[in-house]
Amino acid sequence: MKKFILLIIFYLIYFISFSQKTKSEKVSVEKSILSIQTGYFGTWINHELKLHNQFALRTEIGTEYRLKFAIKQSFDSLKNQVSIFLEPKYYFNLIKRESKNKNIKNNAANYISLRTNFNILNNLENGEIYFHTLTPTYGIRRNITSHFNLELSFGYGISYSNSVITLEAMPSFRFGYVF
């Protein structure tokens, strides 16, 4: 009987020792996500790559409309442009959503990010090329079904174009499909 009890204790210790991951180590962003999104402000194809448990790097190409406001002027223009984005994201409430048994598949959580982009085609007649930097963004992504999602975000950042610095509001309302 002693041997049997020792054997059970040994097996319990053995199995418990392999389940030592904390909840924060178990909850993580998806390894790789490829999706297409459309919204009022444009259409995009994007890819998110896991960097760490709560960090992802999003690369994106798309066409979009952008509101532009000059620093010392009023409303300037509404432009359509093709853009390439590079956006590191920090998903800050993955653990909280998981603990409440909410869906976090395909990185369905709140995030903050720092967007950078380069516009490929813009106003070619005037030779304008915009390079956007320092656009902090807050957003949320929620799943509608297993492949469809909704993403809302807002950022306000600085852009540089032909030696002119402007401030830009970057609202986004996107409906997407994850492959």
Model-derived segments and their meaning:
Residues 21-31, 54, 93-109, 144-148:
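Short loop/turn motifs that connect adjacent beta-strands in outer-membrane beta-barrel proteins
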Residues 32-36, 57-61, 84, 108-116, ...:
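Transmembrane beta-strands of outer-membrane beta-barrel proteins
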